[in-house]
Amino acid sequence: FYAFMGLPIALLADRSNRVKIITVCIVLWSVMTALCGVAAGFVTLLLFRVGVAVGEAGCTPPANSLIGDYFIAKKRASALSIYSTGVMLGAVLANLFGGPIAQMQGTDFDAWLKGVGIGWIFSQVDWNLVEGWRIAFVIVGLPGVLVALMVLFTIKEPPRGYSDPPGLVADMPVHWGVAFSELRNKPTFWWMVAGASMVAFVGYGINSFQAPLLQRLHGLNVRDAAVNFGAPFAFMAAIGTFIGGYITEKLTPHWRTAVAWVPALGLLIAAPLYIFAFYSKDLNLVLFFWGTATMCHFSYLGAQYTIGQGVVTNRSRAAAIAVLLIAVSLVGNGLGPYFVGFLSDFFM
């Protein structure tokens, strides 16, 4: 659902108000996340998770389209990198606070609510029966509604092609086939999609088995793996995402293909560093090599969006990003963890 719902939402975003679309999707995403905490069984949890996926799918394509209209071409690399950095900073918070919240008992949360003076609101709840993972879903989900309101009231919908040079404004695509026809004739776009999918394949595979590797080889528990390694790695990914966009922006006036070569060099450096991290016995070396590799690895993130927007007209930007996310989701998230798990079982 996350992969394929991006298509119709992106086409809608290329034709209508993107700020309102993002607002609705954030509300859906947040409310469905909170509802996961009150799911009564597998079916209801599955349905709420589908709602989360649909909400998530509707955010990135229109957000990228907005950024493309707000920033001129030579500034988009850093702007898109800053946007992408938010994903990594979210991962930092998830590693730092997700585990501790999920480990809370219902009575612990009740005591915290009373401590801040709002326990009376939930006086009818039997906190002895509430599991920590349910609390985590609700705490993470509900604040998103406030974020949606901030988006609605602080971001203005710019005209299409607002930051593009005169004469580049394209006609509005009347259906998905028109947008896809434009993409079909852009080989650069498809090479970028293929490259981004392969990088995501490796990245999702590594991230999925990060904690198990630290547990098996170094004896860490889940909390220590998340707080002492997962959070720093996510922070280094955020730094790499930002630096990649910043360097690309500075080099592009002197080196037209910097948007491709900067992430390529980052990935080349990351590969041997990952190998050193996986085989190091010293946890300090693991932290250094893995963190540095992660920083270099994620220098590509802003570049994929920059290329995706740069090769299409402003009327197809959201659609282009939706196609990119389909490929990245199916190849990266769909196959990467499975492949690493298969290799793990095969060699063990």
For every predicted segment, state its role.
Residues N17, V38-T44, G55, I72, ...:
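Helix-breaking motifs and short loop linkers at transmembrane-helix boundaries and internal kinks
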Residues F48-V87:
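Cytoplasmic helix-loop-helix junction between adjacent transmembrane helices
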Residues P158-V193, L217:
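Juxtamembrane intracellular "pre-TM" segments in multi-pass secondary transporters
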Residues A77-G106, G144, F233-T241, L325-P337:
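Glycine-rich segments within core transmembrane alpha-helices of 12-TM secondary carriers
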Residues F4-V43:
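Conserved MFS/SLC helix-loop-helix module at the cytosolic interface between two early adjacent transmembrane helices
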Residues K20-L35, A258-I275:
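Structural signature of the two symmetry-related core transmembrane helices
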Residues Y83, V87-F153, E157:
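Helix-loop-helix hairpin linking two adjacent transmembrane segments in secondary transporters
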Residues A102, E182-F242, C296-Y305, G332-G341:
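Extracytoplasmic gate region of multi-pass secondary transporters
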